[in-house]
């Protein structure tokens, strides 16, 4: 088995991408998953549970957090982060830093939900994909890496890291989604079924 890797450094935005490829003894090239955390973790009692219509605010409140004007509080008067969905990401968060998204992205991307942790200075982009039949959502899953790069350009401007997460329903446990789920992990993104573990978000 042979290991090859390449490193791409973007000097404008100062982030690094590492691509790893493993070839087995039969000469077949196989991707190695860089992500070791996501990838379909089992649901548990210490997670934020989602359904198709569930808002992050409601999921946080179910776990004892207080969400007020997009700020998230837990056991104190000092906010631990922000919950900003859709346009609120820009009007409630980026405007505080006088950041115009057009300086970084040609289009304004509006996530289903986003949790921004002040503790570890990380933005968790959350996209919910729930379906009961094959359809256009399949292709949207494959766009995860592009969307991750777009958000990285935005958040790196203020020194924040970016994590891109899919919350999927059980439909995506079907065998035909194995390759796309592997691809999501390989591209440095994450997915969970129905629930995001609290510790994954630093809560």
Description of each model-found segment:
Residues 1-77, 88-89:
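Nuclease-adjacent, charged terminal/linker segments that flank catalytic cores
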Residues 24-30, 149, 171-203:
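Non-catalytic C-terminal interaction segments of nucleic acid-processing enzymes
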Residues 66, 158-161, 190:
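Short coil/loop linkers at secondary-structure junctions
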Residues 125, 167, 192-194:
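A structural signal for short, well-ordered beta-strand segments and their strand-loop junctions
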């Amino acid at each position: 088995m042979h290991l090859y890797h390449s490193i791409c450094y973007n000097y404008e935005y100062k982030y690094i991408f590492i691509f790893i490829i493993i070839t087995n003894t039969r000469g077949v090239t196989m991707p190695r998953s860089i992500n070791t955390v996501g990838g379909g973790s089992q649901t548990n009692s210490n997670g934020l549970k989602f359904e198709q219509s569930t808002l992050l605010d409601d999921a946080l409140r179910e776990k004892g957090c207080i969400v007020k004007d997009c700020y998230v509080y837990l056991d104190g008067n000092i906010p631990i982060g922000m919950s900003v969905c859709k346009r609120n990401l820009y009007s409630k968060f980026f405007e505080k830093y006088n950041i115009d998204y057009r300086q970084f992205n040609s289009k304004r991307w509006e996530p289903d939900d986003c949790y921004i942790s002040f503790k570890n200075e990380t933005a968790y982009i959350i996209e919910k994909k729930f379906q009961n039949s094959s359809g256009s959502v399949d292709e949207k899953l494959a766009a995860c890496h592009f969307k991750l790069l777009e958000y990285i350009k935005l958040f790196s401007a203020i020194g924040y890291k970016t994590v891109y997460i899919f919350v999927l329903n059980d439909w995506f446990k079907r065998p035909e989604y194995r390759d796309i789920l592997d691809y999501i992990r390989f591209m440095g993104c994450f997915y969970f079924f129905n629930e995001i573990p609290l510790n994954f978000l630093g809560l």
